[in-house]
Swiss-Prot record:
Tissue specificity field: Expressed in PQR, but not AQR, Q neuroblast descendents.
Name of the protein in its database record: Protein soem-1
Source lineage: Eukaryota, Metazoa, Ecdysozoa, Nematoda, Chromadorea
Keyword ATP-binding carried by entry: no
Organism of origin: Caenorhabditis elegans
Keywords of this entry: SH2 domain
Function: Functions downstream of migratory protein mig-13 and may play a role in the control of Q neuroblast migration during larval development.
């Protein structure tokens, strides 16, 4: 005797609206908006649970545990909206570029700084320089625009200078004389 999939779930089309995770776990509970009846009295302290029993949700934490998403209430720990403003996104506005500074001035600013401290200098159209405090003094590394992307020294290509700086804050610079340093603190323009 052969059983059909529809017989396994009780109806021929009822299982199509049920997410796979609920079909796979028979102990899971799926709430619909009709099942969830959270209400407060005039005093604001009486709450009704999804099953209609006020004693099941006597604490105010029950309200915070369910989030209304579409037609179903979902546990808030599973789907919490992110605050996009807290995510750090590197952009060109986060880096400082010295406009009128030569190598000698950069070396003077970096001579008593910590290893990995750096500054960026503008060198004209499509070119800049990264001046970095290394173990043997200050190292100057060319940053060039190749027509499509930026490159620092002989390293990989980047879509912006800030993405290159962000990368080298986490990965060592592949530059002779930089002793495989990572970028630490950028000096702000004076």
């Amino acid at each position: 005797m052969m059983m059909t999939m529809a017989a396994d779930y009780g109806s021929s089309e009822g299982h199509y609206d049920t997410p796979w995770e609920f079909l796979a776990r028979p102990n899971s509970v799926r709430f619909s908006t009709a099942d969830v009846r959270l209400s407060t009295s005039a005093a604001g302290d009486a709450k009704v649970s999804p099953h209609g029993s006020p004693s099941l949700c006597s604490s105010s934490s029950f309200v915070n545990q369910l989030v209304q998403i579409g037609n179903s209430a979902v546990d808030a720990r599973r789907k919490v909206p992110r605050d996009e403003s807290k995510r750090r996104r590197p952009s060109d506005s986060e880096i400082y570029m010295e406009q009128n500074m030569n190598r000698v001035e950069a070396e003077k600013r970096l001579e008593n700084r910590n290893l990995g401290d750096y500054l960026l200098r503008s060198r004209g159209e499509g070119s800049a320089a990264l001046s970095l405090r290394a173990t043997k003094g200050v190292v100057h590394i060319k940053i060039e625009w190749n027509g499509e992307k930026w490159v620092i020294g002989e390293g990989p290509l980047f879509r912006s200078i800030s993405s290159a700086i962000s990368f080298y804050r986490r990965h060592p610079l592949p530059i002779r004389g930089a002793d495989h340093l990572v970028l630490k603190n950028q000096l702000k323009p004076v």
